[in-house]
């Protein structure tokens, strides 16, 4: 039976490239000359360091632009509130990986409401969709693309 997986993943290599490009842009921008503003990447957490909260907002715009240019959907960003002290300001931005249980249940409910003849099951942070016809699976893909979710969804592991 044909099947496919619904996942929400970010390519680590593209993320590294986007952060490097954002750091390069910071070094060339006039409004950041002489400041110690920078992006640091550890795993899937990007830390912004700047001298003020205002600069953090500008840096976030730079990061979003670079992520978009590298093909990474900015809906995967989970921004914490900025921390300010005398030495400067910091903000952590977590890159969301995988589909949470609540979001998976919402997607499954949308699939069931469409009355398509497919089965869906949760496999950890993935969602496996199985059906008898390829056309049904393609209809589910269209449905999931239209569904309002705050995560970027990708489809992989398509089996016939």
UniProtKB/Swiss-Prot annotation:
Keyword Nucleotide-binding: yes
A Pfam family reported for this protein in Swiss-Prot or TrEMBL: DUF520
UniProt entry tagged with the keyword DNA-binding: no
GO cellular component, one term: cytosol
Gene3D superfamilies recorded: 3.30.70.860, YajQ-like, domain 2
HAMAP family with a match to the protein in the record: YajQ
Entry-linked PANTHER family: UPF0234 PROTEIN YAJQ
Stated role: Nucleotide-binding protein.
Name of the protein in its database record: Nucleotide-binding protein BAV0791
Organism: Bordetella avium (strain 197N)
Lineage: Bacteria, Pseudomonadati, Pseudomonadota, Betaproteobacteria, Burkholderiales
